[in-house]
Structures are given as structure tokens and as C-alpha cells.
UniProtKB/Swiss-Prot annotation:
<dbReference type="InterPro" id="IPR020596">
    <property type="entry name" value="rRNA_Ade_Mease_Trfase_CS"/>
</dbReference>
<feature type="binding site">
    <location>
        <position position="89"/>
    </location>
    <ligand>
        <name>S-adenosyl-L-methionine</name>
    </ligand>
</feature>
<feature type="binding site">
    <location>
        <position position="43"/>
    </location>
    <ligand>
        <name>S-adenosyl-L-methionine</name>
    </ligand>
</feature>
<feature type="binding site">
    <location>
        <position position="64"/>
    </location>
    <ligand>
        <name>S-adenosyl-L-methionine</name>
    </ligand>
</feature>
<dbReference type="GO" id="GO:0003723">
    <property type="term" value="F:RNA binding"/>
</dbReference>
<keyword id="KW-0949">S-adenosyl-L-methionine</keyword>
<dbReference type="InterPro" id="IPR020598">
    <property type="entry name" value="rRNA_Ade_methylase_Trfase_N"/>
</dbReference>
<dbReference type="InterPro" id="IPR001737">
    <property type="entry name" value="KsgA/Erm"/>
</dbReference>
<dbReference type="Pfam" id="PF00398">
    <property type="entry name" value="RrnaAD"/>
</dbReference>
<dbReference type="InterPro" id="IPR029063">
    <property type="entry name" value="SAM-dependent_MTases_sf"/>
</dbReference>
<dbReference type="InterPro" id="IPR023165">
    <property type="entry name" value="rRNA_Ade_diMease-like_C"/>
</dbReference>
<keyword id="KW-0963">Cytoplasm</keyword>
<dbReference type="InterPro" id="IPR011530">
    <property type="entry name" value="rRNA_adenine_dimethylase"/>
</dbReference>
<keyword id="KW-0808">Transferase</keyword>
<protein>
    <recommendedName>
        <fullName>Ribosomal RNA small subunit methyltransferase A</fullName>
        <ecNumber>2.1.1.182</ecNumber>
    </recommendedName>
</protein>
<dbReference type="GO" id="GO:0005829">
    <property type="term" value="C:cytosol"/>
</dbReference>
<keyword id="KW-0489">Methyltransferase</keyword>
Amino acid sequence: MNSSFSAPAKKSLGQHFLADRYYIDRIVQAVDPRPGQHLVEIGPGQGAITFPLLRKHGALTVIEFDRDLIAPLTDAAAPIGQLQIIHRDVLAVDFTAVADGTPIRLVGNLPYNISSPILFHALDHASAVADMHFMLQKEVVDRMAAGPGSKVYGRLSVMLQAYCEVTALFVVPPGAFRPPPKVDSAVVRLVPRDAASVLIKDRKRFADVVRAGFGQRRKTLRNALSTVCEPAHFEAAGVRPDARAEQLEVADFIRLANVELA
């Protein structure tokens, strides 16, 4: 039984609504909600994932920016379960406050045009998040999960993997959406690392080092990081200054950012 409703996709909001039952079921299976967990869906859209999750779990919080979807979501959810709707831009939502002491499980088919800002916003609240299951452009998921030496290994890879375990799950073709996007999508799982295992001393400095390193990725680290690192930083961290950012492991960036010179 599918309770999703029809609503026109808004290009300005980057909306592509999932419509294929097979992939909807695969996402719900990947999330595998359990009693007592607090599920939060970002951008429920027409309810393709919302209502199967609600039917399976009984309660769900959703964050929806499009006011035209609020009433249809409310009406369709009424006979199924308890749906709490937060009508707000997701980037303005305080996930820590939403969690209220119980780590939340984030789910969502993220709008292509703001997927990276949403990911970094979620990272800011990692201590309040149990895990995340997101559908994004496959190109973005490839970058998120990439390792050193890959052409798509970059700032997004390092920043996410420093704070989360990142696992690409499966690809979703354009035909599974209405309207179909021009590219493949993919589902990814992110599990925030325990705070004690994230050995980053200064989050801002770490972000600055990673940004500078990949901002000029064809240059050696000596040149790319000239504004944020001195030669002694490389020596203390055991990182070769003639290497390039794409050759460094996540742990290398962490050591480099953590160095404190006397």
C-alpha cells in the first residue's frame, strides 16, 4: 500500500521525487528502523519514503521547506502514524535540539542543489546523530567514499571520513524519479565516529588545512599550504611537503592540523 500523493516538482528547490517501489523498499530496508529510535527525514516530498517508514515505525519527524507539501503530508499521514512536521529550511534546523537527548537517525533524498551544505550542517551536530542514510547524486557519493589516489578524492572525502564511517550502498537510476534527473543517484550511509576517536584538536584549523590543500590540488603541499603551515609542521606530522593533497590519508591531514609549534 502506497500513501504517497502527487505534487508538482519545483525546479527552484531541486526536487526530484522518488517513485520506484523497488528502490523505496531498498532504502527502508537499509534504514531498518527499530522501536524507540527517533527518525528524522529531510525533505519528504510526496512521501515516497515517509509513509513506508511511518507505517513500519509508527512515528516520524520530517523537515519540509515547501509549504505546498505540508497539508498533503499531514492528511496522508493521519491514518498511518504520528507525523511531526518541521516547516523550515533544513540549514536552519538545530538537530541537537530536535534530538533532545536521544540521538536521531537522519534519512533523506537530498536536493541536489544544497546536498553538500546539508552534509556539513549535519556534521556540526554529529554528537546528536546516530546515523544518516541519504540519497544524492552518484557523483557526490563517489566523492564522499573515495580514498587517496582517486581522481574524485577531495575536501568532501576527507571532511566526512574524518568524522564518519562512509559506506556507499547502491545506485538509483534516473528512471526511478519523477521528473527523472539527468544523472544517476546513489544511497550512502554515514555513521558518526565516537567523539573520543575523532582526534581533531581544532575543527576550524583542520577544515582550513583541508580546504587549502585541495584548493590547489595540482600543487605540492609545501605551496598549497603555504598560508596555513610552516616547514616545521610537515616535519612534526611526518608528512612529505612535496606530496599532493590527493596522496594523503585522512589521518595525515589530522596530524598536520594538530601540530602546535612552540
